[in-house]
Amino acid sequence: MKVYKGEVNALPPDKSIAHRAALIGAVADGTTEISNFSGGFDNQSTLGVLQACGIAVHQEKLKGPNGLISRNVVIHAQGFWSLSRPEKDLMCNNSGSTMRMFAGILAAQPFESRLAGDSSLMKRPMQRVAHPLRLMGADVALSSDNTAPVAIRGTTHLRPIDYELPVPSAQVKSLVALAALHAEGESRVIETLPSRNHTELMLGLKVEALSDGRSAVIIPGRKTVPAKPFHIPGDPSAACFIIALGLLSAGSEIVVRDVCLNPTRTGYMGVLLGAGAEISMENIRFAGGEKIGDVLVRHSPSMKPLSISDPAVVANSIDEIPMLAVLSACATGAFELYNAAELRAKESDRISAVVDNLERIGFVCDEYADGFAVTGRKDVTPTGKVAIDSYDDHRIAMSFAIADRVVPMELDISDAKVIGVSFPDFFEIIESLAT
């Protein structure tokens, strides 16, 4: 088994922040400069739909550490109504973030548009997108089973709204905020459980703590958004895979540089630390309201099994749960997850996908509606080459690509190219750490 040591200096730029920087740039007044923008398929899909609506977008490719490519992006806009009617469907490809958040901007435009995507995205629920926009006065049509395509007849007279999120969702919070920027009055988005707060930080929105423990994001209507520069830090969700590799591999020690350490994104690190993982955060600083730092991880053979059930922790670490499950199973032979039904509505049904593939490599699992448990290993461990189904989901593919480095059999992952959605240089970085 290989040992993994060294530094990762070119983590993929954070997808969540990059999406928002581009979308905010499209409604800002002036020129928005974004440094370290991602070349991954999802973020490029956001730039693509902006260009299809007439927004001027320019990209400059730069060669960074290890020869990997980063990008600077410049977006020119003239305020809320800079967009023009697209000539055809706006293709979001596999990016649910693009589809959901851009819908908030399209709802305020004086034209009709339609958001579509690949076969996976077209199966994902969009009722949570349509509902608040309809309440604000936009005409939104979905398929008969409330999935994409999302057809929007916008209006320049959106009504302000007080909207309580039915489930924690930073994407729905952001789409309502982007729509409410155009509305004729002040709006509020109310959260019972906190979700990613990048949109609030980037727009400088006020957040009020309510007496019952909830919080309210305040969005002023029709207040000009001045253009400003954004720098995209490293994606903590991508860092999770490197961290898992370091924790699982004997003798390994890895430093991941310039990671976004926003507390709404690092719940998974708290889960790992609570289980005895050797992880430390160093060189902490702040940029654009975001906490950034370096993460040091060492092989942790004494880790305890992970158990995740707190709804707030689930919401905070929803994207990292597949990797956490695979990590815990490989390290300890056990894992527990509850209150995570939302995982069934991601790029794949991630509960079933993880269970299926863990069973293929010799683990015993119990699956239920809102989670699953790994209860041990089968009496007979598979040998030779084992087929792993990525379910066309980048996080499933990467989770089992990490497992492939530490399990006794060879894993053959279907459609591994889907990893390019969020981490184009995944395999190159992994191999650069191998000693």
From Swiss-Prot:
Keyword Cytoplasm (UniProt): yes
Catalytic residues (UniProt): 319
Gene Ontology cellular component annotations, sorted alphabetically: cytoplasm
What is its pathway? Metabolic intermediate biosynthesis; chorismate biosynthesis; chorismate from D-erythrose 4-phosphate and phosphoenolpyruvate: step 6/7
**Keywords annotated in UniProt:** Amino-acid biosynthesis, Aromatic amino acid biosynthesis, Cytoplasm, Transferase
> Which residues of this UniProt protein bind 3-phosphoshikimate?
15-16, 20, 169, 171, 195, 319, 346
Task: Provide the binding site for phosphoenolpyruvate.
Answer: 15, 96, 124, 171, 350, 395
Task: Give the main localization category.
Answer: cytoplasm
Query: What SUPFAM superfamilies does the record point to?
Result: EPT/RTPC-like
Q: What class of enzyme is it?
A: transferase
Question: How the protein assembles, per its UniProt entry?
Answer: Monomer.
**Name used for this protein in its record:** 3-phosphoshikimate 1-carboxyvinyltransferase
